[in-house]
From Swiss-Prot:
This protein's name: Prokineticin-2
Similarity remark: Belongs to the AVIT (prokineticin) family.
Gene name in the database record: Prok2
Matches recorded under SUPFAM superfamilies: Colipase-like
Record keywords: Biological rhythms, Disulfide bond, Neuropeptide, Secreted, Signal
Species name: Mus musculus
Amino acid sequence: MGDPRCAPLLLLLLLPLLFTPPAGDAAVITGACDKDSQCGGGMCCAVSIWVKSIRICTPMGQVGDSCHPLTRKSHVANGRQERRRAKRRKRKKEVPFWGRRMHHTCPCLPGLACLRTSFNRFICLARK
């Protein structure tokens, strides 16, 4: 190591250590999943923002988090059909959801609702 030509190589090897954040500041990347039941409490299995072909455990929406409304327009129909539709809509919002989520966000935590704040922006807010 006394050779001066080794200094640039040593610096190159140690440089990544200088820019690595301490353990407490690093991002936590949750694991891949197929179903909500594979994720811990307060999480759901949602589409990755970066790679659409995989799903990752994602935290459920807290107050102020952006969300997706996950609602359908209701059509005028007889009572039985409307009850079935309402039941299906409710099931889509539940965690664990037994189907495959097609959006990158989870529903809001219990007690919160996904409410419109502007034309195309929805956030989790306390139910009124």
